[in-house]
A protein has these predicted regions:
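Conserved, single-site charged/polar hotspot
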Residues: 1-505
Length: 505
């Protein structure tokens, strides 16, 4: 009789448990993590498609966030504030990390207390909002006939939540995605108070996934596969040796998941882990659009000590076929004067002289002679290029490999003789009736021996003829394309542009 009672007791107890499922949520880790700055703004709106762990970096409090939730991040004084229906504040910022291995989760119709046991009068361990979730473990019906769910919180605690305010969902999202603006990204994010009054948004992900969002933005996916693979190797080496990364040309153009292409993804996967090394150590590599027929020595364009970079030397680019190989831009004297800090209204440009000290003729300084005296500007390739503003092409000259042809189209009679100069705009002239006037129009009428001719008062009389587009250090993208089309393999392409190196995992 006693045996029968005991068996009946255990049978009744087992009926209380409706479902039991083993589960173990884990934050996704990356073998080669990188962080890419996506934004630095007063506020950012971010949508999370997938399950993410949300951590306050100030106090290490953690929670799981509801899939497809939108968070709004902003600054309040020294703090980062994140609003997801509920507000969170931290002076250190927040981390949002991908979570693996959650098959089912509990979400809530309103704020719900997590209890120590399956009873409403038991200890409250936490309270979760509608924006938060917990990992589902199992369910039971208590002695009052109430259904409760056993759940696991992000901080590792287990507890019970009532079915009356809880819904159990299957996790159907295989690839968690972060959306910022119109672009989507793999991985997680950091929301940091790095800049005063702004929230810095970093995308944290694995290096190989990062490259999938770089290559199609740096090289057309339609180009030869060996060129794409060379680009993947060089981009990987650059990123692996960079202290910080941005999603612009300041580092490498990174468009995220929304810009990935099957062809460039294959190039990344087929070169996985391969980098450029010198003396057995990975090096930081560089690339650009067009060399113009020869790449540059790093010491000729970045004022670096060439002896420290024996792999960043000038090499021929025999198969480069680019629309940017040769170019020409013309400028007015007023444009040049403004770039050098002079007022064209009261300063006359007399001459412009480039100093080409690079092995191929790269210009490292420019001197102008003016009525206010001479001025020389010396600097690396970006300093020189920005002296000559142009439409498009990032707003400045394509490279610092150029020559200058200056045509002084005016001969002006002064009290001291004749001067040859580029322009007469803003200058005083003596008229036939003996009065003096200032030239203010864009054109001037000039009496010649045979007729009156009209000329621009400030013509585009200074012409720069140059080659290449970019800093020209390391790999030319158009050059890599040409080599690939002529039978070169990716590793040999990379070794061509980075002399004295090995290319391997």
């Amino acid at each position: 009789m006693t045996r029968k009672v005991i068996l009946t007791f255990f049978l009744s107890l087992s009926l209380l448990f409706i479902h039991n499922e083993a589960s173990a949520a884990t934050v996704k880790s990356y073998s080669n993590p990188v962080a890419v700055q996506l934004a630095d703004a007063a506020s950012s709106s971010i949508k999370l498609q997938g399950i993410y762990e949300f951590t306050n970096k100030g106090n290490n409090e953690k929670t799981f966030l509801l899939p497809n939730i939108t968070m709004n991040a902003s600054r309040s004084g020294q703090n980062v504030v994140v609003n997801i229906g509920t507000s969170f504040t931290s002076s250190a910022g927040f981390e949002v990390k991908e979570v693996d291995n959650i098959a089912k989760y509990a979400k809530f119709t309103n704020a719900t207390s997590v209890k120590a046991s399956a009873a409403s009068d038991s200890e409250t361990r936490a309270t979760l909002s509608k924006a938060e979730i917990a990992e589902y473990i199992e369910s039971l019906v208590n002695d009052k006939g109430e259904t409760w769910y056993n759940v696991l919180l992000a901080n590792g605690q287990k507890g019970w939540v009532p079915a009356k305010t809880t819904l159990i969902e299957n996790n159907s999202i295989s690839t968690p995605i972060v959306t910022i603006g119109k672009k989507t990204y793999r991985g997680g994010i950091s929301l940091l108070p790095k800049t005063s009054g702004k929230v810095t948004v970093l995308n944290n992900l694995d290096l190989e996934d990062y490259l999938k969002g770089v290559i199609p933005n740096e090289m057309p996916a339609s180009w030869h596969k060996e060129a794409l693979k060379a680009q993947a190797i060089v981009a990987r080496s650059y990123a692996a040796n960079s202290m910080s990364l941005k999603n612009t040309t300041a580092s490498q153009v990174y468009g995220g998941y929304s810009t990935e292409d099957k062809r460039t993804t294959e190039a990344v996967e087929e070169t996985a882990g391969i980098v450029v090394k010198h003396n057995g150590k990975p090096i930081q590599t560089f690339f650009y659009s067009t060399s113009g027929g020869k790449t540059a020595n790093v010491g000729d364009v970045w004022n670096s000590n060439q002896a420290n970079f024996p792999y960043l030397i000038s090499v021929d680019d025999p198969y480069e076929n680019s629309p940017h190989s040769n170019w020409e831009n013309s400028f007015t004297s007023s444009t040049i004067l403004k770039s050098f800090g002079f007022n064209p209204g009261n300063t006359v440009l007399y001459d412009i002289k480039p100093k080409a000290t690079g092995a191929n003729g790269e210009v490292t300084s420019i001197t102008i002679e003016t009525s206010a005296g001479p001025k020389t500007i010396t600097g690396n390739e970006s300093v020189i290029r920005k002296l000559f503003p142009i439409e498009g092409f990032y707003g400045f000259l394509k490279s610092n490999w150029f020559t200058v042809e200056a045509n002084k189209s005016y001969t002006v009679q002064t009290n001291n003789g004749q001067n040859s100069q580029f322009a007469v705009s803003g200058q005083a002239v003596m008229q036939g009736n003996g009065t003096q006037s200032t030239i203010s129009d864009n054109q001037v009428a000039i009496q010649t021996a045979n007729s009156i001719v009209t000329k621009d008062t400030d013509p585009t009389s200074i012409t720069l003829t140059g080659k290449g587009w970019g800093h020209r250090i390391g790999m030319s993208q158009y050059g890599a394309k040409g080599l690939a089309e002529n039978g070169w393999k990716a590793i040999n392409i990379v070794k061509h542009y980075f002399a004295n190196t090995e290319v391997s995992k």
